[in-house]
Amino acid sequence: QEVDRDYSAAISNTIIPRAWIEAAVNAHFRIPWKDKNGELCIGFRPDQIPNIHGAGLDVADEGIDRNASALKQWIILRGVDEWGERDPGVTARRAMANFRQIKGIKVQYDCIGIGSNVKSEFNRLIESGDITIDEIMMIPWNAGDAVQEPFAHIVPDDEESLLNKDFFQNMKAQAWWSIRTRFFKTWKTLQSLDAYLKDGTPIEFYDPEELISLDGSIPLIKQLIKELAQPTGGPGASLRMVVNKKPKDTKSPNLADAVVMAYFPAIDDYGNVSVGSYGA
């Protein structure tokens, strides 16, 4: 299978090309895959989509920054939300109220700065009995943390590719690269599907678990596409990849940050380790 190995180009400009993002809109209706009998299937029916959910919460930090949340079902982004609120306690309650209907959901939340207060509000609600961890779990997500699986290659099973610890400065860079890889593979498999339907060219299949689809009915879809295509990457002082989320004259991509957290779970407080796809 072809893999995206243009590392230098990827980290010297926009991390995710807009064309890849646009291709992922409603991709779950067109993703090619094979059933257990090896038969070609195109797209997923509602009953074929796993009822597995996850969420991300980006907490407003300062100035005109806004809070944002993202909800995904399996590989499909089902919704995003954005609102202004300076009190992290109110923000935490809003997010928990929105997500608690999905029993057992894990919400990855930005725990840096003001976001650190989210866990305090969560613990207060647990202690008061207003919610339980069977309903919802809040998982701190620290963008500055060390990379996950540091000694794994950024392209699994490709020993020529760099190790995670040598390529990424921190978990933020790793997470953005991870979602970039999802968009790349989604775009690639859909391109190959079009070629197959046109002239029979073999399809480039990927495990659907490694892909991404953006529900086209999301009200803020245009803003989300713009935000996902905004961050740039480049080598930091240690020559490892760093992410610049706010190039000159741009606003913080809050929706995109929430989406990245939802698709790249951190090690949680409940004895579980959930790692995202780096390009597997």
Q: What kind of region is each of these model predictions?
A:
Residues K245, D269-A280:
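Enriched but not universal
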Residues Q73-S238, V275-A280:
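Mg2+-dependent endonuclease catalytic cores in nucleic-acid-processing enzymes, primarily RNase H-like
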Residues Q1-D6, T14-W20, K34-G38, Q191-I212, ...:
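Short coil/turn segments at secondary-structure boundaries
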Residues Q1-L57:
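ATPase catalytic-site recognition across NTP-hydrolyzing enzymes
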Residues Q48-Q73:
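Gly/Thr-rich phosphate-binding beta-strand-loop-beta motif of the actin/hexokinase/Hsp70
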Residues D58, D110, N254-D257:
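Acidic active-site catalytic centers that drive phospho-/nucleotidyl reactions
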Residues V3, I179, A258:
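A residue-level signal for conserved active-site and pocket-lining positions in enzyme catalytic cores
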Residues K72, L228-I267:
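Extracellular low-complexity, Gly/Ser/Thr-rich intrinsically disordered linkers
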